Amino acid sequence: MNNFSIISEYKPAGDQPKAIDEIIAGLSSKKRSQMLLGITGSGKTFTMANIIERTNRPTLIMAHNKTLAAQIYSEMKSLFPKNAVEYFVSYYDYYQPEAYIARTDTFIEKDSSINEQIDLMRHAATRSLLERRDVIVVSSVSCIYGLGSPDLYYQMMVNLEPGQSYPRDQLLNDLINLQYERNDIGFERGCFRVKGDNIDIFPSHYSDKAWRLSFFGNELEYIHEFDPLTGEKLAKLDKAMVFGNSHFVMPQETVNNAISGIEEELQKRLEFLKSQDKPLETQRLNQRTQYDLEMLTETGSCKGVENYSRFFTGRNAGEPPPTLFEYLPEDALLFVDESHVSVPQIRAMYNGDRARKKVLVEHGFRLPSALDNRPLKFEEWDKFRPQTVFVSATPGPFELEETGGTVVELIIRPTGLLDPECIIKPATNQVEDLISEMQTTIAQGFRVLVTTLTQKMAEDLTAYLQELKYKTSYLHSNVHTLERIEILRDLRQGTIDVLVGINLLREGLDIPECGLVAILDADKEGFLRSEVSLIQTIGRAARNSAGRVILYADKMTKSIDKAVSETLRRRQIQQEYNEKHGITPKTINRAIHALAEFEKIDSKLDKKQAHTLFDNAAKLKTHIDKLKKEMLKAASNLEFEQAVKLRDQLKTLEEAALELS
């Protein structure tokens, strides 16, 4: 069994050693819940990593959105290169759930676009949890949604070992039952092909590796891992475990039992609808369900099969569905990052899902059992969660209640950086004063973050600053994840000096070059100007030794008073620690080096250069294939900036290839 092993030039420093010891002591004494209060830049992720290494327990880390999950995943992957660090988020690029609007008699069919790369990573996560113990899974709230039963998923697994006998037809049938597709022409993930005595399988958890099974009669002689693009053999394997191409695979006996259960519920529901004098709903439900039953009988699956999941898992009405939590071993560890946001999000998931499905059931689009295809209720999540460490700079009421108000603080930063100086100025002429402060900050070579209350104000302010020739951009909720990363990169590199936003300048936005955070209309009490929001926003200036925060307010609100007082308290503790240990604050600059790597890829390669570099189509095609692999690899590692650059370069090269051919 592999143990967790951190590979890093850094060692715990500042408050980290004490916090690590306290959390581990709490885990050893069987505390179910602990609170790690970590301020911005205090090294929360590195602290979590050290706790994982020392406890040596499989770990799930929950984040409240995909961007933060990706950030934590990337950091953990770099810290634990020899261990399994996995990513588990929703695999939908686009998702429109089925819904019915009774007022207009409008039924909206389910429509979705699945991201193959993220689906692959979800399979890799569940596979790792079933195969090994040195596993860290970084997940969004997706982990509380229904997933195939781990028992069935493992039961359906095909275990392959050289020297064993496997009747060929039986093996091919097993692969089909695992929802692998036979394709002897287009070999891609989730497919298998047959060539003579060889069977090639492209596993669901790989994007660039496949397995070749070499037989002599029914005896499996060798298993080779190979590159599906070039055919090059990469390794000889002692064994291979083939898991389902879907988390909802199940044996035929289970399907047959489920069909019986669905038919029984259908008859009861039809009788109920008839008794309510609802002929349209009766006919609709019968037609839709009979079609699904036909598909299940013939293929073992149907569109929207997850709505019948209760019958496949053998659970009773109202019981919680199987989720990722059931794949975790009993001694697993859970970290809830930015818990002040994540916990309320978990609490809200169930009600929204049920409200939509209840309408579908009432109007004959779904059986009542569809209500059991759902996320966990908050109470269920609270029951299922293993020993938990909540992580936040601003703990919420649930975490404080669970931990009895006891927190483990991470206030001293390893870099010696202080919480920023907070200045309160009148809001009357806030824009004019902001421009003056911007000039000073930009002249020092730093960047400016400005947060407003409304989208209209953010747009107007951005346009006004651009008219005044300030390099300004606006970050809003409609910006795609990759575009968001590009905007932040441009800010870091100085292509942009000022970034304006509303509620996007809070958790997880780390800009070491930020010298000023300006909070407009800070005295307008509400969600965006609450104590928690203000502390989180103030934290954006805490990665620069010269960082300042200006709160524009005409009156002192309770939220401003508490946020500024807490920041001052932390700043004084940090100053005393620095003076005692002779530490000089240093601006964080490590992330800048990561950007330098992306610049090695020239995305501005034009077609003329391509013709010069590659004098024939064959050479160019080989290079294009190589770049495609690199792009997919970058995407799988969530290195989005690199993937975008490679994508742009590929587009240019493919145009050049057309001209050469």
Curated annotation (Swiss-Prot):
**Helicase ATP-binding domain segment(s):** 25-182
Protein's cellular compartments = Cytoplasm
Q: Which UniProt keywords apply?
A: ATP-binding, Cytoplasm, DNA damage, DNA excision, DNA repair, Excision nuclease, Helicase, Hydrolase, Nucleotide-binding, SOS response
User: Superkingdom, according to UniProt?
Assistant: Bacteria
- Domain (UVR) spans 621-656
Which ranges belong to the motif Beta-hairpin?
91-114
Gene Ontology CC annotations of this record: cytoplasm; excinuclease repair complex
Q: What is the protein name given in its UniProt record? A: UvrABC system protein B
Natural source organism: Rickettsia africae (strain ESF-5)
Q: Which gene encodes it?
A: uvrB
